[in-house]
Amino acid sequence: MSEKKNCKNSSTNNNQTQDPSRNELQVPRSFVDRVVQDERDVQSQSSSTINTLLTLLDCLADYIMERVGLEASNNGSMRNTSQDREREVDNNREPHSAESDVTRFLFDEMPKSRKND
C-alpha cells in the first residue's frame, strides 16, 4: 500500500513542482506556454476574422454606392433629353449634367441629422 502512495506522489511530483521556500504549487512552464500561445492564436483568429468581415463590408458598401450612382445616372439621363438641353441653352442656363443629378439624388436620399429636430 505504501508503494501505491509513493507511486501517486511521484507522479504528482513529476507534473507539478513545489517551491520549498514558498510552499506554493507551480505549473510546469511548458503548460503555461501552451495556454498563452493558445490564447494568442484565438485572438489572432478573431482579429483576422474581424478584419476580413470589415473588408467585405467595405467592398459591399462600395458596390452598392456604385450601383446606386449608376441607377441614378440612368434615371437622370432619361429625364434629361436633348429638348431639355436646348431649352436650357435658349434660356442662357448651363445644361444639367448627369453628375449633378446623381449628387443631388444621393444627398436627397441620405438620412437627415436628428440634431436639427
UniProtKB/Swiss-Prot annotation:
InterPro entries: Histone-fold (IPR009072)
Residue span of region Disordered: 1-30, 71-117
GO biological process, one term: heterochromatin formation
Disulphide bond pairs: none
Coiled coil: none
Any one of the GO CC terms: nucleus
Compositionally skewed regions (Polar residues) per UniProt: 72-81
Compositional bias of kind Basic and acidic residues: 82-117
GO MF terms, alphabetically ordered: protein heterodimerization activity; structural constituent of chromatin
Signal peptide: none
Quaternary structure and interacting proteins, as annotated: May interact with the N-terminus of HD.
Name of the protein: Huntingtin-interacting protein M
